[in-house]
Structures are given as C-alpha cells and as structure tokens.
Amino acid sequence: KAWFVLSMRAVGGLFVDLWTSVAKTVKGWL
C-alpha cells in the first residue's frame, strides 16, 4: 500500500500548492 501513501502525499502537495497560489491571489485583490 506504499503507492497509496505516495499518491496521497502527491495529492496533498498539489492541494498545498493550489491553496498557496489562491491565498496569494486573494491577498493581491484585498
């Protein structure tokens, strides 16, 4: 099940990158 953990980490990293970019955009608007 190592592939499952790795895939979850990859998805988590993508969400973190997406969230940080969204936060930067929102800060730019405010």
From Swiss-Prot:
Broad enzyme group: hydrolase
Signal peptide: none
Keywords: Carboxypeptidase, Hydrolase, Protease
Catalytic activity: Release of a C-terminal alanine from a peptide or a variety of pteroyl or acyl groups
A molecular function GO annotation: metallocarboxypeptidase activity
Transmembrane segments: none
Record carries keyword Iron: no
Coiled-coil spans in chain: none
EC number: 3.4.17.6
GO biological process, one term: proteolysis
Source superkingdom: Bacteria
Name the UniProt record assigns to this protein: Alanine carboxypeptidase
Naturally occurring in which organism (per UniProt): Geobacillus stearothermophilus (Bacillus stearothermophilus)
